[in-house]
Amino acid sequence: MRTYTPKPGDINRQWHVIDATDVVLGRLASQTATLLRGKHKPTFASHMDMGDFVIIINAEKVALTGAKLEQKRAYRHSGYPGGLTSVNYAELLESNPVRAVEKAIKGMLPKNSLAAQQLGKLKVYAGPEHPHAAQQPKTFEITQVAQ
């Protein structure tokens, strides 16, 4: 029997909406990365973009365990000498919670050219509203261990 290779027309993309309220950031990122890559599908191929669209709402209410809120830092560099800036996650979640969630998910995607396409299917919103109701997204529940 020959190995099945999916064609671009065979890819069926769905829309999922995830509520990030009180969900641990790492668990949210790993589940979202699986959906974006399409690893939950039986027709998964690592060399193709098979993933679904993912909408994350309430990114401002995401949880971090332990002392990560104060100790974990996010770094950026402007490209100029001495242009390294860092901010802890408490300040990052207060100023731009969308960036904190996107950064965690981007770190769990493969480091190749497909990552940009897969990250393009991610829509993150700080509040409970999103403009994608016309796509009829399905609710995706993340099983949470008690904190």
From Swiss-Prot:
Cellular component annotations (GO), alphabetically ordered: cytosolic large ribosomal subunit
Pfam family, one: Ribosomal_L13
GO biological process, one term: negative regulation of translation
Cited Gene3D superfamilies: Ribosomal protein L13
Keywords: Ribonucleoprotein, Ribosomal protein
A GO molecular-function descriptor: mRNA binding
Keyword presence, Ribonucleoprotein: yes
UniProt cross-references to PANTHER family, sorted A to Z: LARGE RIBOSOMAL SUBUNIT PROTEIN UL13M, RIBOSOMAL PROTEIN L13
Function: This protein is one of the early assembly proteins of the 50S ribosomal subunit, although it is not seen to bind rRNA by itself. It is important during the early stages of 50S assembly.
Assigned protein family: Belongs to the universal ribosomal protein uL13 family.
Quaternary structure note: Part of the 50S ribosomal subunit.
Record-linked NCBIfam families: rplM_bact
Protein name as catalogued: Large ribosomal subunit protein uL13
Organism: Paenarthrobacter aurescens (strain TC1)
